[in-house]
């Protein structure tokens, strides 16, 4: 399996790609056009907080995939009105970036993406806070 990361608008690291491949490989259907990977911390809630859920969608064929998007979710609202919303959304195919304030060209995320990725990898690989599901 190969995930294209060179030449992207954002500085996706080899460490990120290698970890993603390692998580996907045991579960991936050989001819799958889409691979969706969900990362969830079971205790995350609107009331108590925790580690944001993350969804990564890959698209491709013949074992070669592109990152379609990486979305980090958070709760917005209070009490029964709280709902999961996109906190950060890196849309590689569409070339857009979304945060809680609006939509922007993806290049706007050049500074925040490395910080997000480093934090995410720490939570996932070093602290093991996520349950990972490959669809």
Predicted regions and their residues:
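Generic structural signal of hydrophobic/aromatic residues within well-ordered alpha-helices
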Residues: 16-20, 24, 70, 112, ...
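Amphipathic, interaction-prone secondary-structure segments
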Residues: 28-67
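Short, solvent-exposed aromatic-acidic interface loops
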Residues: 67-80
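Low-complexity, intrinsically disordered terminal/linker segments enriched in charged
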Residues: 77-99
